[in-house]
């Protein structure tokens, strides 16, 4: 079942995907292709003389506008008459075309979410995405323009700040009266035209058909229903108010006109000041803005126009053409304006529309038979700079219009005490939005919701200082023909309107028209002068560039000539050096050739001399060889004779030697027998001597022992006697006893050191000599500090020899063994040296090295020898 459902839905899903794909291709891919095609066509149609349109400006080419904050200008209001308006502010304003505004606001309209009825309205107009050129093209606009707009009739709605606020109040009080006024001022079609409409259309020579799209709030539905005579749809929640760019500028003109009218009223009666009230309504909380806001800080929610439209030279030329055409139209319309100015003001200025109202008013261009058809439906664009130049002219005319407007509204509006005055922040917001629309728009106009009605008792007028600041902002941001010493007038408007005489009103209109014509002539003169000045500057710049190019070319030629000259100098110097080197080389070669020839001659002479010397030497050698051969022959003969004689003598000698050998053999045998006998006799004598010596030694030992015993007895007796004497004289002679004791101790030490026991042995070398007194070093008191027992002097051992080593037989055996050493290898065999690693199970590198800390070469006394003799000083003989 699920498979069947999936198969049934498959065509629907495929159709949806295909529709999405086709929509994406139409909206994105084809749009890009069309735009690329248009840009390519424009590029190939410009004869390659225009600058690239799609290339952005570098940061150095961008001329960003820098405005002062309104709060910063408040403190400078008193210095405005003395200060000069900045030319940079007027010169840096870029020309913003009406087509750019319409495209920007159309893009905003495309991005807004519309309801169901708004979608129906958008389906009647353009619904698909457009390229930048299509949005800018006037052909698309001609499709939705009504027929009466193409036939010279231009319905105009002029909306000022005060009119908008009064209209909000009137919507709630007298909707029916306002509806009648709307229908009277704006006819529904072109069939029932009135003189007011034609005069209003003629009094507004709009050079460009631009549209300003303002979103609407639901509070203006009633007003939209009353305007069904010139609307396409009636019950739409979100529609647009389409105003011309010229009309946006006229809002400020109306403000300035009202300022002039109120200032005239201020001259007649004193101004009234009111205090602040905490109950003053200030409108919606969302629509309020701070006065201290940055003009550049608001994020823009609209899309920028393309760089091709912004920086195109073709568009600049188009704008210049449209400006000139607009001037000619103004000249032609001037007499007509003079005749129908009053009716045009009543028809165009009596309309009061709030800012958020849904109204569609399209401003078409005036009929110009000389312009091509493209300019008819596209409209003539005028830059902001040209509009701001003419703004002073429009202020005079709109001031007169305001006078008639106030008189006509007096019959249908309640007294002005019941009208709401614009609040502090709403006035700032309105002026900021107007300036943004004129400057090309850093951000879109914010949505305004009308404030709730408020009784006149709660309305608080703004301070005069704030109004001064607003007027100053207008003067600073709008370049006009205001003099340097112009006086800032008050914005304060009283509740009671002035009553104007119709003749005075007509006179003022004529005067305003005359001033406007004079200002137009002055502006044209200034434009011509500026044009001439720019042409002169361009000519000077061109001449300067040509001069610089010529200078650079001359400089390059000079550098090239200088370089060639240096190269020629280098080549000449190189040739000169080469020639000099070649001459030097030839001279050296000649000298070398002469030296070589001389050497060859000398070598030839030496060779001849050597040849002669070799010949002489060869002759001498031959003579010497001949003489040597003769001598050798003689010597050989003498040798033979001498050898014969020697052989004879040797033979006789051999015979004699044989006889002598026999005799010597006999004598040797006799000598051997005699030696054997002598050895036997000598051995017997020696044995007898040893026995005798042993007997004598025993006797000597016995005598020594007996003598020693007697000496010990005597010593004991002497000691007893000495002890007794010492005890008797102990009390009397203590110092003498101490001295004697010291002397005895010293003598005892000397006896010990000089004891004959060390030198009294038979084997000692000093046996028959007197002992030498030891040499005592006073620094170490005779002590050998660098030695131990192993370094005792063997000639004078410090330890006594034991009794077992002092026997006569032992000494004789030692002497015999010393002179006749036994063959140890024959007696005991080869003794292998022990391996200490195997015995101690350790391996040390210093087993077979002497590791004693003693200094073996240091003698005990300074006069002793470092190398000792044989042990016991025994010498071989």
From Swiss-Prot:
Record key words, sorted: Cell cycle, Cell division, Centromere, Chromosome, Chromosome partition, Cytoplasm, Cytoskeleton, Kinetochore, Microtubule, Mitosis, Nucleus
Region (SAH): 503-715
Region (IN box): 781-823
Motif window: PXVXL/I motif: 155-159
Source organism (scientific name): Gallus gallus (Chicken)
Subunit relationships: Component of the chromosomal passenger complex (CPC) composed of at least BIRC5/survivin, CDCA8/borealin, INCENP and AURKB; in the complex binds directly to AURKB via the IN box, and forms a triple-helix bundle-based subcomplex with BIRC5 and CDCA8 via its N-terminus. The initially reported homodimerization is questioned as the SAH domain is shown to be monomeric. Interacts with CBX5.
Classification lineage: Eukaryota, Metazoa, Chordata, Craniata, Vertebrata
Positions of the UniProt region annotated as Interaction with CBX5: 135-270
Compartments, record wording: Nucleus; Chromosome, Centromere; Chromosome; Cytoplasm, Cytoskeleton, Spindle
Name of the protein this chain belongs to: Inner centromere protein
Keyword Nucleus: yes
């Amino acid at each position: 079942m699920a498979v069947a459902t999936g198969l049934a839905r498959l065509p629907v899903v495929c159709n949806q995907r295909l529709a999405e794909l086709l929509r994406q291709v139409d909206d994105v891919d084809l749009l890009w292709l069309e735009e690329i095609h248009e840009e390519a066509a424009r590029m190939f149609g410009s004869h390659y003389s225009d600058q690239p349109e799609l290339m952005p400006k570098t940061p150095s080419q961008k001329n960003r506008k820098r405005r002062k904050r309104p709060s910063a200008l408040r403190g400078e209001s008193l210095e405005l008459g003395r200060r000069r308006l900045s030319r940079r502010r007027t010169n840096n304003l870029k020309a913003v075309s009406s087509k750019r505004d319409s495209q920007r606001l159309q893009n905003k309209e495309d991005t807004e979410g519309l309801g169901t009825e708004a979608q129906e309205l958008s389906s009647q107009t353009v619904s698909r995405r457009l390229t930048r050129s299509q949005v800018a093209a006037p052909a698309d606009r001609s499709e939705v323009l009504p027929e009466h707009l193409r036939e010279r009739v231009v319905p105009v709605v002029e909306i000022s700040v005060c009119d908008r606020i009064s209209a909000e109040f009137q919507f709630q009080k007298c909707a029916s009266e306002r509806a009648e006024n709307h229908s009277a001022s704006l006819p529904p079609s072109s069939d029932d035209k009135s003189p007011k409409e034609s005069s209003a259309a003629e009094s507004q020579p709009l050079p460009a058909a631009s549209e300003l799209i303002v979103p609407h709030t639901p509070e203006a539905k009633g007003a939209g229903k009353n305007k069904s005579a010139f609307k396409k749809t009636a019950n739409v929640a979100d529609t647009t108010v389409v105003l011309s760019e010229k009309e946006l500028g006229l809002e400020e003109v109306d403000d300035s006109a009202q300022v002039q009218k109120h200032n005239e009223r201020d001259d007649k009666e004193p101004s009234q000041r009111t205090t602040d009230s905490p109950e003053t309504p200030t409108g919606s909380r969302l629509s309020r803005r701070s006065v201290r806001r940055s003009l550049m800080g608001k994020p823009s929610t609209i899309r920028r126009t393309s760089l091709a439209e912004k920086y195109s030279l073709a568009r600049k030329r188009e704008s210049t053409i449209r400006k000139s055409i607009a001037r000619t139209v103004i000249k032609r319309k001037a007499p007509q304006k003079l005749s129908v100015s009053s009716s045009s003001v009543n028809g165009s200025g009596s309309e009061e529309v709030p800012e958020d109202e849904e109204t569609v008013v399209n401003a078409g261009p005036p009929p110009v038979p000389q312009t091509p058809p493209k300019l008819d439906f596209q409209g003539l664009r005028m830059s902001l700079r040209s509009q701001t130049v003419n703004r002073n002219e429009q202020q005079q005319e709109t001031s007169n219009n305001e006078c008639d407007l106030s008189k006509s509204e007096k019959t249908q509006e309640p007294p002005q005490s019941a009208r709401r005055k614009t609040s502090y922040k709403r006035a700032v917001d309105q002026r900021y939005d107007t300036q943004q629309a004129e400057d090309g728009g850093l951000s879109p106009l914010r949505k305004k919701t009308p404030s709730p009605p408020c009784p006149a008792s709660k309305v608080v007028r703004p301070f005069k200082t704030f109004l001064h600041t607003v007027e100053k902002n207008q003067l600073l941001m709008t370049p006009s023909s205001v003099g340097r010493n112009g006086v800032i007038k008050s914005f304060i408007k009283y509740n009671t309107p002035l009553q104007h005489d119709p003749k005075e009103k007509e006179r003022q209109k004529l005067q305003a028209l005359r001033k406007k014509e004079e200002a137009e002539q002055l502006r044209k003169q200034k434009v011509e002068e500026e044009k001439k000045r720019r042409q002169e500057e361009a000519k000077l710049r061109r001449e300067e560039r040509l001069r610089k190019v010529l200078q650079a070319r001359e400089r390059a030629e000079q550098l090239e000539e200088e370089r060639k000259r240096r190269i020629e100098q280098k080549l000449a110097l190189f040739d000169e050096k080469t020639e000099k080197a070649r001459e030097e080389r030839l001279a050296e070669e000649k000298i070398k050739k002469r030296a070589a020839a001389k050497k060859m001659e000398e070598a030839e002479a030496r060779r001849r001399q050597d040849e002669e010397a070799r010949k002489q030497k060869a002759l001498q050698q031959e003579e010497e060889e001949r003489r040597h051969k003769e001598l050798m022959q003689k010597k050989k003969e003498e040798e033979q004779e001498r050898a014969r004689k020697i052989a004879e003598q040797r033979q006789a000698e051999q015979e004699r030697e044989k006889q002598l050998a026999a005799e010597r053999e006999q004598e040797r045998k006799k000598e051997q027998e005699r030696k054997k006998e002598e050895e036997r006799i000598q051995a017997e004598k020696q044995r007898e001597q040893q026995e005798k010596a042993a007997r004598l030694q025993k006797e000597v030992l016995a005598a020594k022992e007996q003598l020693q015993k007697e000496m010990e007895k005597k010593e004991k007796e002497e000691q007893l006697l000495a002890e007794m004497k010492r005890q008797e004289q102990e009390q009397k002679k203590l110092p003498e006893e101490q001295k004697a004791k010291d002397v005895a101790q010293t003598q005892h030490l000397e006896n010990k050191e000089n004891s004959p026991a060390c030198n009294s042995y038979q084997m000692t070398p000093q046996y028959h000599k007197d002992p030498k007194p030891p040499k005592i070093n006073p620094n170490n008191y005779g002590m050998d500090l660098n030695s131990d027992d192993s370094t005792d002097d063997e000639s004078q051992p410090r330890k006594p020899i034991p009794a077992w080593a002092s026997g006569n037989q032992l000494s004789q055996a030692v002497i015999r063994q010393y002179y006749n050493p036994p063959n140890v290898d024959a007696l005991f065999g080869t003794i292998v040296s022990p391996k200490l690693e195997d015995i101690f199970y350790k391996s040390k590198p210093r087993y077979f090295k002497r590791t004693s800390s003693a200094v073996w070469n240091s003698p005990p006394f300074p006069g002793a020898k470092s190398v000792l003799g044989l042990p016991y000083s025994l010498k071989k003989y």
